[in-house]
UniProtKB/Swiss-Prot annotation:
Keywords: Hydrolase, Metal-binding, Metalloprotease, Protease, Zinc
Residues annotated to bind Zn(2+): 465, 469, 472
Cofactor note (record): Binds 1 zinc ion per subunit.
Leading EC class: hydrolase
Top-level taxonomy: Eukaryota, Amoebozoa, Evosea, Eumycetozoa, Dictyostelia
Cofactor: Zn(2+)
Disulfide bond residue pairs: none
GO molecular function, one term: metalloendopeptidase activity
The organism of origin for this protein: Dictyostelium discoideum (Social amoeba)
Alphabetical list of InterPro entries matching this protein: MetalloPept_cat_dom_sf, Neurolysin/TOP_dom2, Neurolysin/TOP_N, Pept_M3A_M3B, Pept_M3A_M3B_dom
EC number: 3.4.24.-
Pfam families: Peptidase_M3 (PF01432)
Protein name: Thimet-like oligopeptidase
Family label: Belongs to the peptidase M3 family.
GO biological process assignments: peptide metabolic process; proteolysis
Length: 673
């Protein structure tokens, strides 16, 4: 199994540091051999390909040493994995700025006339250009003094990112409420909350998704919602405010050293969008389009709030006409029930976890010609962790890869939903092969003593989305690890996973593939209820997308221009929430401090979610026309989009599949505008 999985989690805390030191020594030795090759003897194979082989070994061990920072139940393991991640990150930054290594690649290109008349494949030529680009992004063209300064800045940014994420994962905030204060929250949901033993009858609400979301959605007590939202918006505010604000300043400084106006200009230069001007015009265009619709939606929600207040005998003279941020989820849900008769508590009875996972797996298996089989989990980090093999049913059941799933919340675990590509997959021309391994971490509703884990429809959508990332990794058919799976431009990486969300809104899929009542799996979601769910899909959709644009604009604002131009991130966040989302967060909060994307790889790139939805909607139009379970289309999707990873520009990938350039029309159509 170890031969296939290529992971080896250390058995003790001491092993982490020992293995990380050995890893750096081995990598240095390998680089030395590449650097010492005489200039006249340099070839693609002994310089570029040799580096990829070295990188693969480094990355495999690095995953083994750092991943458990996100998942281990042992705080000591999480801490040492974070320490090792900081050490390896510092080492990687220094390596990516080595002049002698860069010179080896430059010499190789010169020796081979920039490979202009070579028989290198398109992917090999891309490997050359991306390797050189990586060094140039790290300032190898700068004088030594500036390079040293840049290295110092990049190392500090990396350290800050690790601390920022760790603070969010380690948050232990919980608030105690009586049953009266939790009025409206379903009984079985309250049963899943931790009991407050010091106050009999009280329950704790943590800031994890399965606690916060039902509270904001169902609790009739506005003061409870206000308190929970305030705590959530203040998560890590003390620890992460200085980290976030310092990082923004450091990024600006780094961008200036590299010859860019600001960090957003630097990042966008290497993405599909090409420039920060294009990001800002895209966001502004979408904002203008959505705002009038959102104003209408807010008016309806305000009227509903007042109507309910008066129906309960409230005094019109003392009515508070404000519509607060903690009102949103609650009145949206009331409207869903009143206007569409969609009760999410009833809906989730038809989504028991074991039915949903089987259904989602079946959809992916049927559509993409693959098969998943549970296998004994290799070095599992928790008893709930499961592992599956993935084989290609269209090609003699050949193994494609393995994936882990770890789906329920626990202390110290990564608190959102994400997929880690632990081991890159590739097959070289000489037959050398490595199978990909991915890990999917989520925080779905846990089972209670009386009911199994029942997923909300939103959680079903999240599962489908994240599993799209898993399949992007499993489907990889590239020659070089640099291009494996989700190693694509950041503003394309969400396209496949967002595409698969559409299956969660298909009537046949919902009824026949994903649902089965938890008391009797043969009882499917009633057809009329599904039709009402689909009809309500775009309920208050403009508000939802304005919120996405608000987050993208906040991300863009802190990375555009000089950070000295804004006083602090809390004020900036509040202003953008007021002006853009039309619904400000509570004063005294700063949700930017727990906005993991900002220091988790989406810096100046949060626009990517909405941007890539335009691509996924364009692809889904074809499935919608020819059938969502069309195997021929599924095979095309797997081979033309998922399998190619980053081995070609993503603009080429999307145009190859569509037969034309994507546009925003398909997306606007899906949201009913």
């Amino acid at each position: 199994m170890e031969e296939l999985i290529k992971l080896n989690f250390p058995k003790s805390v001491e092993e982490y540091k020992k293995q990380s030191e050995e890893l750096m020594e081995t990598y240095d030795k390998g680089l030395k051999e590449i650097i010492e090759i005489p200039k006249e003897k340099r070839t693609f194979a002994n310089t570029f390909e040799a580096t990829d082989k070295l990188d693969v070994k480094f990355r495999n061990i690095e995953s083994s040493l750092t991943f458990l920072a996100n998942a281990s139940t042992d705080e000591k393991v999480r801490d040492v994995a974070n320490e090792v991640e900081a050490t390896l990150s510092k080492y990687s930054i220094a390596t990516s700025m080595r002049e002698d290594l860069y010179q080896a690649y430059v010499d190789c290109c010169k020796q081979n006339n920039d490979f202009k008349e070579s028989d290198l494949s398109k992917e090999q030529l891309r490997y050359v250009s991306k390797t050189l680009e990586g060094f140039e992004k790290n300032g190898l063209q700068l004088p030594k003094e500036k390079r040293e300064k840049l290295k110092e800045i990049m190392t500090k940014i990396s350290d800050n990112s690790i601390k920022f994420s760790k603070n969010i994962a380690d948050d232990k905030t919980k608030l105690s409420f009586s049953m009266e204060q939790l009025n409206g929250i379903p009984k079985e949901t309250i049963e899943s909350f931790e009991k407050d033993e010091s106050k009999p009858g009280n329950y704790f609400i943590s800031l994890k998704y399965p606690d916060v979301i039902p509270t904001m959605k169902y609790c009739t007590v506005a003061e409870t919602r206000k308190a929970v939202e305030f705590a959530n918006g203040s998560k890590c505010i003390k620890e992460n405010t200085p980290i976030l604000e310092e990082t923004c300043k450091l990024r600006f400084e780094a961008a200036q050293l590299l010859g860019f106006k600001d960090w957003a200009s630097y990042k966008s230069n290497y993405l599909m969008v090409k420039s920060n001007d294009n990001i800002q015009s895209f966001e502004e265009r979408m904002r203008k389009l959505l705002t009038p619709h959102a104003v209408t939606e807010y008016d309806r929600l305000k009227q509903l709030k007042k109507k309910i207040y008066l129906e309960k005998g409230g005094n019109p003279e003392t009515y508070d006409d404000h519509y607060y941020s903690y009102d949103n989820a609650f009145y949206n849900n009331v409207m869903l029930v009143q206007d569409y008769q969609v009760d999410n508590n009833l809906v989730k009875e038809y989504f028991p976890f074991e039915v949903v996972i089987k259904g989602i797996f079946n959809c992916y298996q049927e559509l993409l010609n693959v098969k998943f089989t549970e296998v004994p989990a290799y070095q599992p980090w928790h008893e709930e962790v499961k592992m599956y093999s993935c084989v290609d049913t269209a090609d003699s059941n050949k193994l494609l890869g393995h994936f882990y799933i770890d789906l329920f919340p626990r202390e110290g675990k990564y608190s959102h939903a994400a997929v880690w590509p632990l081991i890159p997959g590739y097959e070289r021309a000489d037959g050398e092969k490595q199978y990909p391994v991915a890990a999917m971490l989520c925080n779905f509703t846990k089972p209670t003593p009386t009911t199994p884990s029942l997923l909300t429809h939103d959680e079903v959508v999240t599962f489908f989305h994240e599993f799209g990332h898993v399949m992007h990794n499993m489907s990889t058919k590239v020659h070089y690890s640099m291009f494996s799976g989700t190693s694509v431009e950041r503003d394309f990486v969400e396209c496949p996973s967002q595409l698969f969300e559409f299956w969660c809104w298909n009537k046949d899929v919902l009824v026949n593939k994903l649902s089965g009542h938890y008391k009797d799996h043969s009882k499917k979601l009633p057809t009329d209820l599904v039709e009402r769910m689909i009809a309500a899909k775009n309920l208050n959709v403009a508000i939802f997308y304005l919120r996405q644009i608000q987050l993208a604009l906040f991300d863009n604002a802190i990375h555009s221009g000089n950070p000295a131009n804004f006083t602090n991130t809390a004020d900036l966040y509040h202003r953008i929430a007021t002006d853009v989302a039309l619904n400000p967060n509570q004063k005294g909060t700063n949700p930017g401090c727990s906005f993991g994307h900002l220091l988790g790889g989406y810096d100046a790139q949060y626009y990517s979610y909405l941007y890539s939805e335009c691509f996924s909607a364009s692809i889904f139009e074809i499935f919608d026309k020819h059938g969502v379970m069309n195997k021929e289309l599924g095979a095309r999707l797997r081979n033309q989009v998922l399998a190619v990873g980053g081995s070609q520009p993503s603009s080429e990938t999307i145009e190859n599949f569509l037969g034309s350039k994507p546009n925003e029309a398909a997306f606007l159509k899906t949201i009913g505008l």
